[in-house]
């Protein structure tokens, strides 16, 4: 343990929220910084920060700002929700942006204030939202050229200090081995559950042993970001040549807890 400070419309993006991402904004360059905001206020505490929007090289742009709730589906794809109430640990209701809409002249940098207050009585743990800076097509001062549109987003994480306990487990593990192809492939799927109140990013390995417990090979397990209370399917695909026989596959994940999470399977290569 450690102390640390229905929407009917949803958009699914095939990306991990580890920083900033963009939807096309046209030929001219537009930038938003920083890619993520983190705050650690206590229950009832006020927090404040800012993001900077850098204007296009030669175009005036109309801009609006807002927050959206998000989470991951079991495969790790990001899901955004246009209506609130779908995400249990959402921080969106606590957050404010100012200004909400403005005209950004070419080559000008604009500061956007982000602030809020954690409701009194909020339990310790991680809460989150996503800010968006959307560029609206604007032609009031243009007679030709590219019209810029699209949006840039970044993550907001609020950690309410207290007893934040990283707990989790591997609830399922399957293993396969294909020999029909030119390159024999070891495959499988791990389902990891985050049973704690903080965001986990487990890393680990898959150990392949023979029945005499001799280590034959090691396969890295892809990293994943798993929200509190969520399950994540982690796919395994790795080229590995094995002789015929039975083997033991041991999945080991370090998620920051006192012990590694583990799961064992026996499989056969024919």
Regions found by a protein language model. Give the residues of each.
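Short, solvent-exposed loop/turn segments enriched in Ser/Thr/Gly
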Residues: 33, 43-50, 110-112, 123-130, ...
């Amino acid at each position: 343990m450690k102390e640390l400070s229905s929407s009917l419309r949803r958009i699914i993006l095939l990306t991990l929220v580890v920083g900033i991402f963009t939807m096309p904004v046209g030929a001219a360059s537009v930038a938003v910084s920083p890619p993520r905001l983190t705050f650690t206020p206590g229950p009832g505490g006020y927090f404040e920060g800012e993001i900077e929007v850098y204007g296009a090289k030669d175009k005036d742009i109309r801009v609006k700002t807002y927050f959206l709730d998000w989470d991951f589906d079991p495969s790790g794809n990001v899901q955004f929700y246009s209506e609130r109430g779908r995400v249990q640990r959402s921080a969106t209701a606590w957050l404010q942006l100012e200004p909400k809409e403005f005209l950004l002249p070419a080559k000008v940098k604009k500061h956007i204030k982000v602030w809020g207050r954690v409701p009194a009585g909020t339990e310790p743990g991680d809460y989150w939202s996503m800010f968006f800076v959307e560029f609206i097509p604007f032609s009031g001062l243009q007679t030709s050229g590219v019209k810029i549109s699209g949006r840039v987003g970044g993550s907001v994480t609020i950690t309410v200090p207290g007893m934040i306990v990283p707990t989790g487990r591997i609830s399922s593990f399957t293993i396969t081995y294909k020999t029909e192809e030119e390159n024999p492939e070891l495959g499988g799927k791990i389902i990891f559950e985050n049973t704690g109140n903080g965001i986990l990013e487990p890393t680990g390995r898959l150990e392949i042993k023979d029945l005499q417990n001799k280590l034959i090979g090691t396969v890295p397990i892809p990293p994943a970001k798993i929200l509190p209370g969520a399950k994540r399917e982690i796919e395994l695909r790795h080229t590995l040549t094995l002789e015929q026989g039975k083997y033991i596959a041991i999945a080991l994940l370090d998620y920051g807890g006192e012990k590694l999470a583990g799961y064992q399977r026996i499989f056969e290569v024919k």
